[in-house]
Amino acid sequence: MAALVLPNSLPEELAARTFLRFLRGAPRPAAGGAAPLAYRLAYVHDLLVELARHGLAAPDAAAAAFGGARPPPAPAGVPAAAARAAILTVEAATRAQSESDLWTLLRRGLATASTVRWGADGPHFPPTWCEASTARCGTPDNAALIFGRV
């Protein structure tokens, strides 16, 4: 995936695409539950699709980062190594803009994903603390975060 050159400030519509909002609109999993990792990947994938739709990324950016397909929200759907590779690909493509709105959104979104309580029927709501702001702030020292841990 080629480097993404994004404006430091994303359009308001994109800056508002929090992980919580993504989860609220995500389909509920079939019997057997869903992997929290798969939802994280689907969120990052959807952000890349929206960046492309707004002309801020190549039309194939999401496909390039995820090996040509949307990650399915199912436990067996995404091997851990493939998930890590996809996220690191996105991080590498945007590393020069670590203070951009995209990284702020991803830091908060992926931290939110780590704190959501998951059950057999998917995420339990509401982790409302992430609704307050997506303003930039220091990166927490959390091993669950990839973005910002170069």
UniProtKB/Swiss-Prot annotation:
Keywords, in A-Z order: Endonuclease, Exonuclease, Hydrolase, Nuclease
Domain of life of the organism encoding this protein: Viruses
Keyword Nuclease attributed: yes
GO molecular function annotation: endonuclease activity; exonuclease activity
SUPFAM superfamilies: Restriction endonuclease-like
InterPro entries reported in the protein's UniProt record: Restrct_endonuc-II-like, Viral_alk_exo
Family membership noted in the UniProt record: Belongs to the baculo-herpesviridae alkaline nuclease family.
Protein's UniProt name: Alkaline nuclease
Native source species: Suid herpesvirus 1 (strain NIA-3) (SuHV-1)
Gene: UL12
